[in-house]
């Protein structure tokens, strides 16, 4: 368990691997969402400076969906196909319930977990000063692992093309009206906002780990995005004003 100044950091890793050289890159994410996949892929392509011809994945819901109920064949999601089209990647996947078809990648997943555990033991602590410090630790571990793989990586890179100059946006854009309770609802989660925004219509950029709220072109708030599909993120400073104006609220 990794902690940030003593607080557990719940997270996953988006792990990308080139099977021939075993070059790998991993980025921290909160879930197996499509935005996590986009962020992890773009971070990996950014490190490589090139793009492969094929993008192979398992049957994560970020990439595929059931064609019909019952666990049969699955099809690629439209968003995933748009991602592949943007980078001119040919999407491929494994058969349902056949993880051995990604044996090399699955093996690298296990090696990565053991490598991180060893580096944390050598570090002497699983606690980090900030999420950025932990991300830098991950990057150092990845760079060290990739050191001996450079010869084969050079062969792979020689067969690749540069990625497009413009990455995909790593957020979804939504609109939300601020309620009389000084809250908005995004993806089934309730978030409080400053009471001065009551009644306003906000543009919300939904990133994998944060929400950015705009009134017109002005960014008025940035809040951490909650995990899960229900709950509330309430800052009492946002709602205490309206409550104080209500007789008997306290």
In which residue ranges do the predicted regions lie?
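Protein C-terminal end segments and domain termini
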Residues: 211-250
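Short conserved beta-strand segments at catalytic cores or DNA/RNA-binding microdomains
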Residues: 8-22, 56, 83, 112, ...
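Active-site beta-loop-alpha junctions of metal-dependent nucleic acid enzymes
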Residues: 9-11, 26-54, 73, 226-232
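Two-metal-ion acidic nuclease core segments, chiefly of the RNase H-like superfamily
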Residues: 72-91
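RNase H-like two-metal-ion nuclease catalytic core shared by retroviral integrases
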Residues: 57-58, 70-71, 89-114, 129-132
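Acidic/histidine-rich, metal-coordinating catalytic segments
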Residues: 50-72
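Active-site-proximal acidic segments at structured loop/helix or strand boundaries
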Residues: 109-208, 218
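Two-metal-ion RNase H-like nuclease active-site motif
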Residues: 1-3
